[in-house]
């Protein structure tokens, strides 16, 4: 019995996150009420508060879980130690991971302005943890003389922006497969830091 | 007398756009009412309708004027004909132009989803007009053998994403001047298409 109740609660929690994600992505955080989210998943608005104390916490959890999932996934991707193979693995990982989560990526950028200062600081720490992995690859590559990197921080931001930008134009029904996109982007990233 | 009335109307129109831009950037289009915009500039909501028929038209004009201004500015930048100097001039122009307009750039990306299909199509045409200028430079460079470009469309999207991405991290009070940022980004763009 406890188990069934637990499963149902977990299920409602998951549907709540999914509904909030879609409503925030479509209309924006500020325009969506807890009442609308409750209606979307077919529960009373009071029932939501068993799962989440308020809308700000809901937004923060969505963004923070997106970053936690990214950090776990990059860990699981087993990026090699050698700088150039590491950069290739990171490039391909970043494109694939983000292309599979367009709504999370969109609200992660768009709704930063709606986080409380405390929540924004927590999210920034997660983001910097991810960015630091790419910066470390570039610094190792520059130190080993296999990459030219004037400024590891700017190169990190440039590479992440160009890779995440794939989400703005890539369509699965388009002329190119994601594998072809990865290939061309890896060529551009490799040249961008060519020693 | 006509002249004074005309100037006042133009002034209200400009203040209306500025207020809408800031409110949309802060709260999102869907969360902002015409009443709030009117309150922000100190007029009755009925007075807004002398300037703009509805909120959708207001959003479209903001985004469309941003693109029109971009197209005029790139024209005025007198990009040279030679491919490599053209790419350098385009890179520097794009960073400078966008860094000076963070709110317009932000809502131009974020509020695309709130345009009507007709307005979206009009804006897309303007955007493609701009992107085509960069694609043409890359194609000329590849044809002349001074650039390596596997896919001019993807290289265009990659370069624009990385350059516009400067807006997400650059602060005028930071460790770098915009001139230094331009310099490092031009180095990365040049290598990205190195033949």
Where are these regions (language model features)?
Chain A
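N-terminal intrinsically disordered/low-complexity leader segments
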Residues: 1-11, 150
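Helix-turn-helix
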Residues: 15, 19, 23-57, 61
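Short amphipathic alpha-helical elements of helix-turn-helix/winged-helix folds
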Residues: 19-23, 93, 97, 162
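Short helix-capping/turn signature of helix-turn-helix
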Residues: 52, 109-115
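Hydrophobic alpha-helical connector segments
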Residues: 61, 75-103, 155-159
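Amphipathic alpha-helical packing segments from all-alpha helical-bundle domains
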Residues: 65-71, 118-143, 153-157, 183
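Hydrophobic/aromatic-rich alpha-helical bundle segments in the mid-to-C-terminal region
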Residues: 105-110, 120-121, 142-188
């Amino acid at each position: 019995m406890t188990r069934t109740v637990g499963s149902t609660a977990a299920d409602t929690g998951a549907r709540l996150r999914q509904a909030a994600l879609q409503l925030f992505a479509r209309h924006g955080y500020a325009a969506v009420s807890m009442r609308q989210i409750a209606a979307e998943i077919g529960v009373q608005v009071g029932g939501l508060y068993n799962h989440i104390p308020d809308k700000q916490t809901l937004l923060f959890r969505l963004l923070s879980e997106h970053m936690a999932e990214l950090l776990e996934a990059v860990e699981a991707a087993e990026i090699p130690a050698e700088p150039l193979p590491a950069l290739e693995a990171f490039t391909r990982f970043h494109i694939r991971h983000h292309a599979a989560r367009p709504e999370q990526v969109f609200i992660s950028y768009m709704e930063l302005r709606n986080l409380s200062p405390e929540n924004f600081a927590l999210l920034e720490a997660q983001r910097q943890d991810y960015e630091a992995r790419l910066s470390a690859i570039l610094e190792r590559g520059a130190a080993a003389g296999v990459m030219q990197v004037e400024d590891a921080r700017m190169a990190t931001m440039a590479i992440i922006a160009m890779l995440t930008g794939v989400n703005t134009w890539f369509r699965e029904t388009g002329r190119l497969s994601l594998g072809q996109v990865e290939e061309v982007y890896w060529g551009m990233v490799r040249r961008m830091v060519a020693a």
